[in-house]
Regions:
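Sec/Tat signal peptide C-region and signal peptidase I cleavage site
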Residues: 13-19
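A post-motif C-terminal structural segment
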Residues: 24-27, 32-102, 146-486
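Alpha-helix C-terminal capping segments
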Residues: 105-107, 129-133, 172
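General structural concept
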Residues: 113-117, 139
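Glycine-rich anion/phosphate-binding loops
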Residues: 116-124, 161
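Surface-exposed amphipathic alpha-helices with a cationic face
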Residues: 126-131, 349, 353
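Glycine-rich phosphate/pyrophosphate-binding loops
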Residues: 127-128, 132-151
């Protein structure tokens, strides 16, 4: 009977076709990587000692989002009866950041790469569509601007880790007006300048030296606005540069490469996460680097450039590292990164209210996926079959979803990570197929509620991550294009 009811509910809430009448001049999508419902809640508890305390948790539109990749599914009944339904990491079960970003940025599910469908065909991104509409566009991240999430909105590649190729594409071919992130080849993970920079003409992960030198010298660009003239990139690097860019006149195109993270040989780079001494600590036990801008400072710099366009803009802003905190089982580190993200959300809200309005700007807050399977102590009663087991195995009748323990403000909540990935070590955890939260406010926000796919027994109504693209494109075009483009 329960299964039948679930099926009927899913049918009743099938996504409806989008109609005209809702439009937005600007769309801001803010993504906290690897932060599901319990990561948000843990940060609430740590910051304020109570749930529901972030400003976005009072937004008028709040939904769940399914995140599965091509070939996957989300079953709201099984999700709450069997840990294995949302755990593990089979290719068609649990998404990666690149796949989730591609879904949100193109409306297509994929099985790998960025900006492609499940058959490896190149598909239009929302950045490209916004550019066709005459809008300014940007991507901002606390890791490399060529990494999975920003790349999924702004590039096309079969290999998500072909960062050298993605950088070339973003700087030389795309019409992006803003690209900001870390992985500066001249600086280590502590923001200290290197005697020998990390360049390579062969490694797919690292900057090509000639590209770096040319872009810093103002020699790379293309016709980004269709006026027949080349718009070259202006490069900013220091925290003071980012802070200054937040006010006053700006160049037409800005590449911000934070002075940090160049020694990450797999190209991710981070503004804060790999600073020396920071491990499984309470938040900010090792203070954030003073040399790296906060995500708030990066966001305000980007907005000050993008709002020069009278036709409006699209920007994706990512807080990248709740994900890695949760991968290592370091909840305190995930919380400090989420606090940085929360501060950025508040800064963006203040910017909208001072420089735009909710009548013309849509703000969407969400995540690409949950990481770690975070629950309270005692969750998932049962033990892995063996230390080398391929995934955390729990029988359905043993699945216990224990809430986090609120230890009060300033204290890390009582918790347990449940989704081990054993081949990476006993204390490494992976993405899950749990729903993630979405919060929205502003022009066209209510359109998201027309795309509800089903009702989760715990999280309530939910949409799919591909619907974020559909709604973004819809509010930009006021329904002037066919509603369904994706293959979901």
């Amino acid at each position: 009977m329960v299964v039948l009811v679930a099926v009927l509910v899913l049918c009743m809430f099938a996504a409806t076709a989008l109609a005209g009448g809702d439009s937005a001049k600007n769309v801001i999508i803010m993504i906290t990587d690897g932060c599901g419902y319990n990561c948000v809640l843990a940060t609430d508890y740590y910051q304020y000692g109570a749930a529901g305390t972030q400003v976005y948790e009072r937004f008028p539109v709040q939904l769940g989002v399914s995140t599965y990749p091509a070939g996957g599914h989300y079953n709201p009944y099984l999700a709450w009866t069997d840990f294995n339904e949302v755990g593990g990491w089979a290719a068609n079960r649990v998404t990666e950041s690149n796949m989730a970003a591609t879904a949100m940025g193109t409306g297509y599910k994929c099985a790998g790469g960025v900006g492609i469908d499940e058959h490896a065909n190149r598909v239009p991104t929302i950045v490209e569509i916004a550019e066709q509409l005459g809008k300014a566009t940007g991507v901002v991240s606390t890791q490399s601007f060529a990494e999975a999430t920003p790349a999924g909105f702004s590039a096309h590649a079969l290999d998500r880790k072909a960062l050298k190729s993605i950088i070339e594409q973003q700087l030389r071919e795309s019409k992006l007006d803003v690209a900001m992130g870390a992985h500066n080849p001249w600086y280590n993970n502590n923001g200290e300048k290197l005697e020998t920079p990390y360049f390579s003409d062969t490694s797919k992960y690292l900057w090509k030296e000639s590209t770096w030198n040319d872009v810093v010298a103002g020699k790379i660009g293309n016709d980004a606005d269709g006026d027949g003239e080349v718009e070259y990139w202006d490069v900013i690097e220091s925290r003071a540069d980012f802070q200054a860019m937040a006010t006053g006149p700006t160049p037409e195109r800005v590449l911000g490469v934070v002075q940090c993270g160049g020694e990450d040989k797999v190209g991710s780079g981070y503004t804060q996460f790999y600073r020396t001494g920071a491990a499984n600590d309470a938040p900010f036990t090792v203070p954030f680097l003073e040399t790296s801008p906060t995500l708030s400072e990066m966001s305000l710099a980007a907005l000050n450039v993008l709002d020069n366009d009278p036709d409006g803009f699209f920007v994706m802003i990512e807080g990248a590292n709740p994900d890695y905190g949760n991968h290592f089982g370091w909840l305190g580190r995930a919380i400090e990164e989420q606090i940085d993200f929360n501060d950025a959300v508040e800064a963006v809200i203040a910017w909208v209210e001072a420089n735009s309005s909710w009548d013309e700007t849509l703000l969407v807050i969400t995540s690409d996926h949950e990481t770690g399977g975070i629950w309270g102590p005692g969750a998932g009663v049962g033990t892995p079959a063996a230390p080398s087991a391929s995934r955390f195995i729990v029988k359905p009748d043993q699945s216990v979803f224990v809430p986090l323990v609120n230890n009060g403000a300033g204290q890390v909540p009582g918790h347990l990570y449940t989704n081990h990935r054993w081949e990476y070590g006993p204390d490494f955890y992976w993405h899950t197929n749990q729903l993630v939260p979405l919060y929205a406010k502003g022009a066209g926000a209510s359109v998201l509620t027309t795309q509800v796919r089903g009702v989760d027994p715990v999280r309530g109504p939910y949409i799919d991550n591909t619907d974020i693209f559909q709604v973004t494109r819809h509010v930009f075009t006021d329904g002037a294009v066919p509603a369904q483009v994706g293959n979901n």
